[in-house]
């Protein structure tokens, strides 16, 4: 088996689908084209986290049943998508043990009360019943109790950055936590601490809406395995994201001009 550390821009969903337009499908096809993977093994055996379309990743991973050691620049050249990067790989005998997952969300700073958000976030840290802050998956029976290790919130004039660390997460759990904290920061919730206690209880059944997927990135899935990164692929990733940053800065300038002139 080989474990691959991967990154992607969020324009595709993650998990293998019949239509073939997902992160896993693109990586599998590249490995097949290189002759490293047999078609019967095209579905990954294991992964670090399943993400929805719109959610980016810098440190997810996939595990494939394969014997040949891959040359990563060659794999990268075969990827038929410019928003996926195979950053590193390592041969393994057993599946990795996950220590924690780290998500980060970037919110526009609309005069949020950041200190109130920080105070409220402390109520979410620890082991709680998170069913009301997740999307119910009727096809699977999952224990809704999860443990959050830490939540860190920082801000500047334009953005609020929220980092969430946990053992594992329910479907849409991070995005719903973000929406809750954002609404608290906008003073949309009268008694934040009391409401958090309510929404973390099994008696509350209303749930809570999610924030948009586009602000979320899976920063890392920390495991007990160290994976060496390929310098060529890292350069490719940095160049691509730098180009995106420059385009976004130009767009930001245009937006500021329009808003200041009207």
UniProtKB/Swiss-Prot annotation:
Spans traversing the lipid bilayer: none
Annotated EC: 5.4.99.12
Gene Ontology biological process terms from the UniProt entry: tRNA pseudouridine synthesis
Catalytic activity from the UniProt record: uridine(38/39/40) in tRNA = pseudouridine(38/39/40) in tRNA
CDD domains to which the protein is assigned, alphabetical: PseudoU_synth_TruA_Archea
Keywords carried by this UniProt record: Isomerase, tRNA processing
Annotated protein name in UniProt: tRNA pseudouridine synthase A
Organism of origin: Methanococcus maripaludis (strain DSM 14266 / JCM 13030 / NBRC 101832 / S2 / LL)
Gene giving rise to this polypeptide: truA
């Amino acid at each position: 088996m080989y474990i691959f550390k991967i990154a992607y821009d969020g324009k595709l969903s993650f998990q293998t689908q019949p239509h073939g337009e997902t992160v896993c499908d693109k990586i599998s096809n590249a490995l097949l084209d290189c002759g490293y993977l047999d078609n019967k093994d095209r579905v990954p055996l294991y992964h670090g986290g399943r993400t929805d379309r719109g959610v980016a990743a810098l440190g997810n991973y996939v595990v494939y049943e394969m014997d040949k050691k891959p040359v990563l620049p060659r794999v990268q050249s075969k990827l038929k998508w410019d928003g996926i990067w195979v950053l590193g790989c390592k041969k393994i005998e057993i599946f990795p043990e996950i220590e924690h997952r780290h998500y980060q969300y970037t919110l526009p700073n609309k005069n949020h009360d950041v200190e109130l958000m920080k105070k409220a976030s402390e109520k979410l840290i620890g082991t709680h019943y998170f069913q009301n802050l997740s999307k119910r998956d009727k096809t699977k029976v999952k224990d809704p109790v999860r443990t959050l290790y830490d939540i860190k919130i920082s801000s500047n004039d334009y953005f609020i950055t929220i980092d969430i660390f946990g053992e594992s997460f329910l479907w849409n759990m991070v995005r719903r936590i973000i929406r809750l904290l954002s609404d608290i920061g906008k003073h949309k919730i009268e008694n934040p601490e009391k409401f958090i206690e309510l929404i973390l209880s099994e008696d509350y059944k209303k749930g809570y809406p999610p924030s948009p997927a586009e602000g979320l990135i899976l920063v890392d899935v920390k495991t007990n395995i160290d994976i060496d990164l390929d310098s060529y692929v890292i350069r490719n990733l940095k160049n691509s994201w730098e180009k995106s940053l420059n385009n976004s800065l130009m767009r930001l300038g245009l937006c500021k001009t329009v808003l200041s002139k009207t």
